[in-house]
Amino acid sequence: EVGEADRAAWPDVPMAELCKQAIDPEIGRDTTVFLAQDKAGHIGAGTSTSGWGWKYPGRLGDSPIIGAGSYADTRYGACACTGVGEMSIRAGTARAVVLYMKMGMSVEEAVHEAVDDMRALKGGLIGRVTIHAIDAAGGPKVVAVNGLPEYHYWLWREGEAAPASHPA
Protein backbone atom coordinates (compact mmCIF):
# COMPACT_ATOMS: atom_id res chain seq x y z
CA GLU A 1 0.00 0.00 0.00
CA VAL A 2 1.18 3.53 -0.75
CA GLY A 3 1.83 5.27 2.54
CA GLU A 4 2.35 8.85 3.65
CA ALA A 5 6.13 8.49 3.34
CA ASP A 6 5.73 7.46 -0.32
CA ARG A 7 3.42 10.38 -1.00
CA ALA A 8 5.84 12.80 0.65
CA ALA A 9 8.75 11.42 -1.40
CA TRP A 10 6.85 11.55 -4.68
CA PRO A 11 8.07 11.29 -7.42
CA ASP A 12 11.15 9.59 -5.95
CA VAL A 13 9.42 6.34 -4.94
CA PRO A 14 10.12 2.79 -6.13
CA MET A 15 7.84 2.32 -9.13
CA ALA A 16 7.93 -1.49 -9.09
CA GLU A 17 5.79 -1.67 -5.96
CA LEU A 18 3.30 0.83 -7.37
CA CYS A 19 3.09 -1.16 -10.62
CA LYS A 20 2.55 -4.36 -8.64
CA GLN A 21 -0.36 -2.73 -6.82
CA ALA A 22 -1.83 -1.36 -10.04
CA ILE A 23 -2.08 -4.84 -11.58
CA ASP A 24 -3.15 -6.68 -8.42
CA PRO A 25 -6.69 -7.97 -9.15
CA GLU A 26 -7.66 -7.34 -5.52
CA ILE A 27 -6.63 -3.67 -5.73
CA GLY A 28 -6.50 -2.61 -9.38
CA ARG A 29 -9.43 -2.08 -11.67
CA ASP A 30 -10.07 -2.72 -15.32
CA THR A 31 -10.64 -0.39 -18.21
CA THR A 32 -13.98 1.38 -18.06
CA VAL A 33 -16.29 1.19 -21.07
CA PHE A 34 -18.98 3.71 -21.92
CA LEU A 35 -21.50 2.98 -24.67
CA ALA A 36 -24.23 5.57 -24.96
CA GLN A 37 -27.22 6.39 -27.12
CA ASP A 38 -29.03 9.72 -26.98
CA LYS A 39 -32.73 10.38 -27.56
CA ALA A 40 -32.08 11.04 -31.25
CA GLY A 41 -30.46 7.61 -31.60
CA HIS A 42 -26.88 8.81 -31.95
CA ILE A 43 -24.42 6.29 -30.53
CA GLY A 44 -21.01 6.88 -28.97
CA ALA A 45 -18.31 4.69 -27.48
CA GLY A 46 -15.41 5.44 -25.21
CA THR A 47 -12.96 3.66 -22.96
CA SER A 48 -10.66 4.65 -20.18
CA THR A 49 -7.29 3.04 -19.83
CA SER A 50 -6.60 0.60 -17.04
CA GLY A 51 -3.81 2.85 -15.89
CA TRP A 52 -0.08 2.54 -16.17
CA GLY A 53 0.36 -0.82 -14.43
CA TRP A 54 0.65 -2.67 -17.75
CA LYS A 55 1.95 0.31 -19.72
CA TYR A 56 5.63 -0.43 -19.58
CA PRO A 57 7.84 1.65 -21.92
CA GLY A 58 6.97 1.00 -25.54
CA ARG A 59 3.60 -0.66 -24.88
CA LEU A 60 0.47 0.93 -26.25
CA GLY A 61 -2.84 -0.55 -25.16
CA ASP A 62 -5.97 -0.73 -27.27
CA SER A 63 -7.91 2.06 -25.50
CA PRO A 64 -6.65 4.92 -27.71
CA ILE A 65 -6.86 2.93 -30.95
CA ILE A 66 -10.21 3.52 -32.65
CA GLY A 67 -11.37 0.22 -34.07
CA ALA A 68 -9.49 -1.85 -31.50
CA GLY A 69 -10.48 -0.45 -28.10
CA SER A 70 -13.70 1.24 -29.18
CA TYR A 71 -15.76 2.00 -32.26
CA ALA A 72 -19.21 3.46 -32.92
CA ASP A 73 -21.40 3.96 -35.96
CA THR A 74 -24.89 5.26 -35.23
CA ARG A 75 -26.30 3.28 -38.16
CA TYR A 76 -25.29 -0.10 -36.69
CA GLY A 77 -24.08 0.08 -33.09
CA ALA A 78 -21.03 0.46 -30.90
CA CYS A 79 -18.44 -1.71 -29.23
CA ALA A 80 -15.64 -1.32 -26.71
CA CYS A 81 -13.23 -3.84 -25.23
CA THR A 82 -11.39 -4.45 -21.98
CA GLY A 83 -8.73 -6.93 -21.00
CA VAL A 84 -5.60 -7.86 -22.94
CA GLY A 85 -5.53 -5.01 -25.44
CA GLU A 86 -3.09 -6.73 -27.77
CA MET A 87 -5.84 -9.20 -28.67
CA SER A 88 -8.28 -6.40 -29.53
CA ILE A 89 -5.59 -4.61 -31.54
CA ARG A 90 -4.63 -7.70 -33.55
CA ALA A 91 -8.25 -8.53 -34.41
CA GLY A 92 -9.59 -4.97 -34.70
CA THR A 93 -12.29 -6.25 -32.40
CA ALA A 94 -14.41 -3.16 -31.77
CA ARG A 95 -14.62 -2.29 -35.48
CA ALA A 96 -15.23 -5.93 -36.37
CA VAL A 97 -18.26 -6.18 -34.07
CA VAL A 98 -19.84 -3.09 -35.63
CA LEU A 99 -18.99 -4.32 -39.14
CA TYR A 100 -20.66 -7.67 -38.42
CA MET A 101 -23.80 -5.80 -37.34
CA LYS A 102 -23.61 -3.79 -40.57
CA MET A 103 -23.53 -7.11 -42.43
CA GLY A 104 -26.81 -8.10 -40.77
CA MET A 105 -25.73 -10.03 -37.68
CA SER A 106 -27.46 -9.46 -34.37
CA VAL A 107 -25.39 -7.87 -31.61
CA GLU A 108 -25.06 -11.30 -29.98
CA GLU A 109 -23.92 -12.98 -33.21
CA ALA A 110 -21.49 -10.13 -33.92
CA VAL A 111 -19.82 -10.36 -30.51
CA HIS A 112 -19.47 -14.14 -30.76
CA GLU A 113 -18.02 -13.85 -34.28
CA ALA A 114 -15.44 -11.36 -32.97
CA VAL A 115 -14.48 -13.83 -30.21
CA ASP A 116 -14.02 -16.49 -32.91
CA ASP A 117 -11.80 -14.01 -34.83
CA MET A 118 -9.51 -13.64 -31.82
CA ARG A 119 -9.38 -17.40 -31.25
CA ALA A 120 -8.38 -17.87 -34.92
CA LEU A 121 -5.30 -15.63 -34.58
CA LYS A 122 -1.91 -17.30 -34.62
CA GLY A 123 -1.34 -18.27 -31.00
CA GLY A 124 -5.06 -18.11 -30.23
CA LEU A 125 -6.85 -15.96 -27.71
CA ILE A 126 -4.32 -15.18 -25.01
CA GLY A 127 -5.54 -13.74 -21.73
CA ARG A 128 -8.79 -12.16 -20.72
CA VAL A 129 -10.94 -10.04 -23.04
CA THR A 130 -14.40 -8.61 -22.46
CA ILE A 131 -16.42 -7.26 -25.37
CA HIS A 132 -19.20 -4.76 -24.67
CA ALA A 133 -21.57 -3.90 -27.53
CA ILE A 134 -24.91 -2.31 -28.31
CA ASP A 135 -26.87 -2.42 -31.53
CA ALA A 136 -28.54 0.56 -33.22
CA ALA A 137 -31.65 0.00 -31.09
CA GLY A 138 -29.59 0.06 -27.89
CA GLY A 139 -29.75 -3.69 -27.29
CA PRO A 140 -26.69 -4.74 -25.25
CA LYS A 141 -24.45 -7.79 -25.35
CA VAL A 142 -21.42 -8.32 -23.13
CA VAL A 143 -19.18 -11.38 -23.35
CA ALA A 144 -16.30 -12.06 -20.98
CA VAL A 145 -13.79 -14.57 -22.38
CA ASN A 146 -11.17 -16.24 -20.18
CA GLY A 147 -12.19 -13.90 -17.40
CA LEU A 148 -13.99 -13.85 -14.15
CA PRO A 149 -16.64 -16.57 -13.81
CA GLU A 150 -19.28 -14.02 -12.84
CA TYR A 151 -18.75 -10.84 -14.85
CA HIS A 152 -21.38 -8.10 -14.50
CA TYR A 153 -21.92 -4.86 -16.39
CA TRP A 154 -24.08 -1.84 -15.63
CA LEU A 155 -26.91 -0.68 -17.88
CA TRP A 156 -28.98 2.46 -17.44
CA ARG A 157 -32.00 2.85 -19.68
CA GLU A 158 -34.16 5.91 -20.13
CA GLY A 159 -36.87 6.08 -17.53
CA GLU A 160 -34.98 4.02 -14.97
CA ALA A 161 -34.11 5.72 -11.69
CA ALA A 162 -30.63 4.18 -11.55
CA PRO A 163 -28.36 1.84 -13.49
CA ALA A 164 -28.75 -1.88 -12.87
CA SER A 165 -26.17 -4.65 -12.78
CA HIS A 166 -26.55 -7.45 -15.34
CA PRO A 167 -24.59 -10.69 -15.79
CA ALA A 168 -22.56 -11.01 -18.99
State each model region's role.
Residues 1-168:
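N-terminal nucleophile
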